[in-house]
Regions:
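Structured segments of extracytoplasmic/periplasmic soluble domains
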Residues: 4, 41-48, 72, 83, ...
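Conserved hydrolase catalytic core segment
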Residues: 52-91
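A catalytic-pocket lid/entrance helix-loop region that shapes and gates access to the active site
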Residues: 75-123
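Conserved alpha/beta-hydrolase
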Residues: 1-20
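Short, solvent-exposed loop/turn and secondary-structure capping segments
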Residues: 18-22, 68-69, 91-95, 171
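Cap/lid segment of the alpha/beta-hydrolase catalytic domain
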Residues: 14-32
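Conserved acidic catalytic loop of the alpha/beta-hydrolase fold
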Residues: 33-53
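Alpha/beta-hydrolase
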Residues: 107-189
Length: 189
């Protein structure tokens, strides 16, 4: 893409390099806030590059955000491309939790069962108590069973260390990488 387009890589609030310990304590992340932040980036890009409309590419949670953005501000979006597109994140959360619980029961993983029962199933895509911490716990168990990427059973930290970190070292300072890792652990996205 970089050979043919100007790319703007953006970590939404609380994620990746946008993580701020102070902001993490005092900020409630909402759909509206995410959409307005993204729209501000679009407006900036339109002005900076003298374009009437912008092409948006969204990955993972960014694919949800991309759809929300295109829906609310179609006049600013030339095209939207979803990569790893989330189609029904509420159903996705339900299926993810159910699969993880089923695997824990099947494997007799008492520790995982205790964690999953404590956080309880999501309602409308959200865990009832401390959604961020609950989703991180659920995802850790999901990943342990290979549900996040069935071709790999490595813990996330190993994937980060051996796959993502060498790539990141080419573009980020060590301080930025530390901030990124903190942001990943803060944001469920």
């Amino acid at each position: 893409l970089a050979k043919h387009f100007t790319l703007i890589a953006w970590d939404q609030r609380g994620a990746g390099l946008a993580y701020s310990k102070k902001e993490a304590k005092n900020l409630t992340l909402t759909k509206e806030l995410y959409v307005e932040d993204a729209h501000n980036i679009v407006l900036w890009a339109k002005e900076k590059f003298n374009k009437d409309k912008i092409i948006i590419v969204g990955h993972s949670f960014g694919s949800v955000l991309g759809v929300w953005l295109a829906e609310k501000y179609p006049e600013d979006i030339l095209a939207y491309v979803g990569v790893g597109q989330c189609v029904d994140y509420i159903r996705n959360e339900d299926l993810s939790y159910a699969w993880t619980l089923e695997k824990a029961e099947e494997l007799g993983d008492k520790k995982a069962l205790k964690v999953l029962q404590k956080i309880s199933p999501p309602k409308n895509g959200m865990y009832k108590e401390n959604h961020r911490k609950s989703i991180i716990k659920q995802r850790a168990i999901l990943h342990k069973y290979g549900g996040a990427n069935y071709s790999s059973r490595k813990p996330y930290w190993q994937e980060l260390l051996f796959h993502e970190l060498p790539i990141m070292l080419k573009e980020y300072s060590v301080l930025q990488i530390i901030k990124y890792i903190k942001g990943v652990s803060y944001s469920p996205n």
